[in-house]
Amino acid sequence: MIQVDYSNNESIKAALTGVHVVISTISGAALDVQGKIAAAAKEADVKLFVPSDFGGITEGETEGIFGEKSNIQGQLKALGIPYAIFYTGPFADYIFASYVF
């Protein structure tokens, strides 16, 4: 177990050093951190980044959580880090949603 300070790029980079593949499972409430993780992954020479974009197709979306996920795809392209997106269908959006009871 490695403790990471997501507000500190060096902390994220240190945690990712020597890692070949990052599979992000960040919830919708924390998607803003995913860009920082991707940037640190690029600096740490991670070979493949899988963003937390499981569910329906989000490419080109501009609104809400789908817009945020689309923005991450743009950031990954700009960083030049290899990435893979697994579209599993819209049902996954409901299964993995954060619910407050």
Model-flagged regions — what are they?
Residues 1-17, 29-35, 40, 44, ...:
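Oxidoreductase cofactor-interface core, primarily capturing Rossmann-like NAD(P)-dependent enzymes
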